[in-house]
């Protein structure tokens, strides 16, 4: 029967459709982790007339000291970022021309990467809070560069420190603490500022504080798409055409201020009515639509600025009628339409009224012209009629014809004069109304002058009592005093603003000076380190040249010669490792290979000199491979980009994440990704348990005696003796290992404890906390591995060995035939690979890359890497021609494999296809066979015990004296 772990990889196969963590889970995570520095700010962007403030969601990333900004909290990809580590900050003081009591400016500048970014906070307090927090983050990040002891395998960014036992090595302090005087000065110059509701994760659930603007903001691309869609709806059969698409490309952060489609259509209709209908559209006037977009020559010629301008005119508030309507509607108590809708309706009615007036005047002019034409045609008809012109002389007819033309001309002139008279009368009426207004203003001015004359008379009468202090505040003499008071208040406000600005700038200068000194000290240390490395290289090169020179000289075999002394000196120098006796020289002292690697494993054993030399060579080869890989586009950059895309969302299964994990998780991110993998697989268990479930098990293990506790104590020091975290009984790792194993023995009494579980927990504790390591063990035993994998019979482990034998015969037939030919049982070696997931079988770098993929994809990864190890050394194994040498080589060949990239390429590339269904079917097939064999063995054992118990001669021992007697 397949185990619980068979469907693990299927849960991640559909990564693109995976759903991120639920809201409750996200809330729980947010409750455990410290609050992030995030919130809404307005960023000045754009060019030309479109330049303005746009509301953006800002999130600070402590790993790289970047301030990312998004369009909204729901966006996955950031629009850009600001490098805070190399930035300096400033802000403008209060404007001198501002009135007293006016709000101070709330925008500040971030100078970074040769550019100035202007950000604006909703109020002054939030601006101060953002500036202080960004200063603090910059200070902590730059100081952490000095406080960290960097290994070449760690990232240069000090964020996301590991949380397990390796975290103790990561945070070793090798330099002095920051300058106490600088810290004290920073504290004194700090300004009290509390975060508001627009800062923190809770701000993501609130609407973005926008800039008041009558025009709705839409992006250029969205506006173009809406226009295209609205046009295609009027053109049947061409709505889905892909050949008529207009796309705007830009590398700037541009946004177009444009109206919604509905308002745009309303603004377009009056504009189209003003234009005469072309001849080609007369036949379409009676159809359902008054015009067609595809054939209207005026539609495409209308510039974009006319559309936006018409919309701005419609929304302008200069019309007094609009203001009056808005005021009346706002003051009425009954249910009315919203003010914008009523304004739009009144505006459209006014435009329609103006259009009707223009149409009426044009119709009148047309009627007048038609009347003149009718008269002229009647006169022409009258004179051309032969019956009327009979008997009349030609001269008389010519004279009459001229008189008629004069009459027509005079009639037209009379009509024109009539029109001019009407216009002049209208102008006279307008001038009369203006004269009336001017008379009213003149009356008001006369009244004002009269009032001033009265004041002057009163002042003249009270000339003797000018110095009297009984003047009230309403007296004209109090006006200069009030102006002085206003000026004094304005100066006080400016003084207060300059004080706060001066305090901030002093703090900024102090911090930048301290950070510059730290950077200079780091540069000096690095220069000293590189000089020491260069000197050491010259020494080694000199010794090699001496050695080569001596090798040319023939030396008697009995004599020692200087060459042997040089070789001995070179070997002695090569076997030296880094010591922790003088940590203050750690920056200057060159160390290529440390005594322990970043995981805590010993790099050079304490055995004979030959073994130490081989281990040193292997460690140097590992470091060379790592440095060579880092010279290319490293996976660390891809991981940073991935985490940048998850600033506003939870991690989820995806092909991108699977490929990143297969290539290996960087050391600084491994704790985070491992914890996420464990939480994803154990979510169903945790949801049904109490929050303090692990602590309850741990308390039970301490209070009650467990049958497995004795075996656990025996195996603690034998777990990873070559790792410094588990080397002594007082090590922190030993205490945590004991707690996790005891807690699991109480959770799963069917297994209790099995040898091999201790190594699984020990590896997990290197990157996970105690409780997370417990759930990691639950994931491996109860989710990944089949049932009875770690029980007394090891049924699942035996089944997997037979499945692996079948896969080896299929994927590597030559090697399988070679093993069968010399009767080599390689499962004696591979059994431990599967039981403890390659712990103590491969070098540490490869081990943790295997565990990365194992915790994400499940147990199928073990089959992949086991086959890849054999394929990696297939040619070397085929050269061995006897069973003893083959078996001896199999016992240590995995420790000689150092190239993790090549091994991963074989595992996930050369061995494909590798379907999970095949492993399931093979497991089910071999499970029945192994069960039958175990049943037969159990029956044989019971028969043997029964015969032994029923035998009369129980084989009692007899002494020599009894035999003699």
From Swiss-Prot:
Protein name in UniProt: TBC1 domain family member 2B
Q: What is the lineage of its organism?
A: Eukaryota, Metazoa, Chordata, Craniata, Vertebrata
Task: Return the GO cellular component terms, semicolon-separated.
Answer: cytosol; early endosome
Rab-GAP TBC domain location? 664-858
The UniProt entry's coiled-coil ranges are 339-537
Principal location class? other
- Give a yes or no for keyword Coiled coil in this entry: yes
Question: What organism does the record attribute this protein to?
Answer: Mus musculus
The domain of life is Eukaryota
């Amino acid at each position: 029967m397949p185990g619980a772990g068979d469907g693990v990889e299927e849960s991640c196969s559909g990564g693109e459709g995976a759903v991120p963590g639920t809201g409750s889970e996200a809330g729980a995570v947010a409750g455990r982790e410290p609050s992030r520095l995030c919130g809404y700010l307005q960023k000045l962007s754009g060019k030309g007339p479109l330049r303005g403030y746009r509301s953006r969601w800002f999130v600070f990333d402590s790993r790289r000291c970047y301030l990312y900004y998004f369009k909204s909290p729901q966006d996955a990809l950031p629009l850009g970022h600001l490098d805070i580590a190399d930035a300096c900050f400033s802000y403008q003081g209060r404007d001198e021309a501002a009135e007293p009591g006016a709000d101070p400016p709330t925008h500040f500048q971030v100078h970074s990467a040769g550019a100035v970014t202007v950000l604006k906070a909703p109020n002054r307090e939030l601006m101060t809070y953002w500036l202080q927090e960004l200063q603090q983050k910059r200070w902590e990040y730059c100081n952490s560069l000095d406080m960290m002891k960097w290994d070449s395998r760690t990232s240069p960014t000090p964020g996301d420190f590991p949380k397990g036992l390796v975290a103790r090595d990561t945070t070793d302090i090798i330099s002095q603490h920051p300058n106490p005087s600088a810290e004290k000065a920073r504290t004194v110059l700090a300004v009290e500022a509390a975060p508001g509701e627009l800062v923190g994760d809770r701000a993501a659930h609130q609407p973005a504080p926008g800039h008041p603007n009558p025009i709705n903001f839409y992006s250029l691309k969205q506006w173009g798409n809406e226009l295209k869609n609205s046009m295609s709806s009027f053109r049947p059969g061409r709505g889905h055409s892909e050949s008529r698409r207009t796309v705007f490309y830009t590398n700037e952060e541009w946004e177009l201020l444009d109206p919604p489609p509905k308002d745009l259509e309303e603004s377009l209709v009056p504009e189209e009515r003003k234009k005469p209908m072309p001849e080609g559209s007369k036949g379409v006037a009676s159809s359902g639509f008054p015009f067609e977009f595809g054939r209207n020559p005026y539609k495409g010629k209308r510039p974009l600025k006319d559309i936006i301008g018409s919309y701005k005119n419609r929304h302008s508030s200069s019309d007094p009628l609009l203001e009056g309507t808005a005021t009346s509607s706002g003051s009425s108590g009954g249910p009315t339409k919203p003010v914008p809708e009523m304004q739009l309706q009144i505006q459209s009615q006014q435009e329609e009224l103006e259009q009707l007036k223009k149409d009426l005047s044009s119709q009148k002019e047309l009627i007048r012209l038609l009347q003149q034409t009718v008269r002229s045609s009647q006169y022409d008809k009258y004179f051309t009629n032969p019956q009327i012109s009979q008997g009349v002389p030609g001269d008389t007819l010519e004279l009459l014809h001229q008189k008629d033309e004069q009459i027509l001309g005079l009639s037209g002139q009379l009509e024109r004069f009539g029109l001019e008279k009407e216009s002049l009368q209208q102008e006279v009426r307008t001038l009369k109304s203006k004269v009336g207004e001017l008379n009213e203003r003149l009356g008001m001015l006369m009244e004002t002058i009269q009032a001033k004359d009265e004041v002057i008379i009163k002042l003249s009468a009270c000339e003797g009592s000018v110095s009297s202090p009984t003047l009230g505040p309403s007296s004209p003499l109090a006006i200069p005093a009030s102006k002085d008071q206003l000026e004094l208040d304005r100066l006080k406000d400016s003084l207060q603003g300059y004080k706060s600005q001066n305090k901030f700038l002093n703090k900024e200068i102090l911090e930048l000076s301290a950070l510059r000194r730290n950077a200079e000290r780091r540069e000096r240390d690095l220069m000293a380190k590189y000089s020491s490395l260069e000197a050491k290289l010259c020494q080694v090169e000199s010794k090699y040249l001496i050695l080569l020179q001596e090798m040319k000289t023939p030396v008697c075999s009995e004599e020692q010669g200087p060459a042997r002394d040089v070789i001995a000196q070179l070997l002695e120098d090569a076997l030296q490792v880094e010591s922790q006796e003088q940590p203050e020289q750690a920056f200057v002292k060159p160390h290529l290979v440390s005594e322990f690697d970043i995981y805590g494993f010993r790099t050079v054993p304490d055995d004979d000199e030959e073994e130490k030399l081989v281990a040193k060579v292997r460690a140097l080869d590992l470091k060379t491979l790592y440095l060579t890989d880092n010279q290319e586009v490293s996976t660390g950059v891809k991981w940073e980009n991935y985490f940048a895309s998850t600033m506003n969302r939870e991690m989820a299964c995806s092909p991108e994440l699977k490929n990143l994990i297969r290539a290996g998780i960087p050391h600084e991110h491994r704790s985070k990704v491992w914890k996420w993998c464990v939480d994803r697989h154990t979510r169903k268990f945790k949801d049904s348990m109490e929050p303090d479930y692990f602590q309850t098990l741990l308390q039970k293990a301490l209070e009650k005696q467990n049958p497995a506790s004795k075996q656990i104590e025996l195996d603690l020091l034998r777990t990873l003796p070559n790792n410094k975290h588990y080397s002594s009984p007082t090590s922190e790792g030993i205490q945590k290992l004991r707690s996790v194993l005891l807690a699991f023995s109480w959770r799963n009494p069917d297994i209790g404890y099995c040898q091999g579980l201790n190594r699984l927990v020990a590896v997990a504790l290197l990157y996970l906390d105690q409780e997370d390591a417990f759930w990691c063990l639950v994931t491996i035993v109860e989710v990944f591995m089949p049932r009875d994998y770690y029980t007394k019979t090891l049924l699942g482990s035996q089944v997997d060995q037979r499945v692996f034998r079948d896969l080896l015969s299929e994927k590597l037939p030559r090697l399988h035939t070679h093993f069968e030919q010399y009767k080599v049982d390689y499962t004696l070696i591979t059994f431990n690979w599967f039981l403890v997931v390659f712990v103590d079988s491969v070098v540490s770098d490869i081990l943790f890359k295997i565990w990365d993929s194992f915790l994400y994809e499940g147990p199928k990864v073990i089959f992949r890497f086991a086959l890849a190890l054999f394929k990696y050394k297939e040619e070397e194994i085929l050269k061995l021609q006897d069973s003893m040498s083959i078996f001896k080589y199999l016992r240590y060949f995995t420790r000689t494999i150092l190239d993790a990239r090549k091994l991963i390429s074989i595992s996930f590339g050369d061995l494909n296809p590798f379907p999970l269904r095949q492993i399931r079917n093979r497991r089910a097939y071999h499970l029945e066979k192994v069960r039958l064999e175990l049943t037969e063995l159990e029956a044989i054992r019971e028969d043997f015990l029964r015969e032994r118990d029923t035998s009369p001669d129980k084989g009692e021992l007899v002494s020599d004296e009894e035999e003699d007697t």
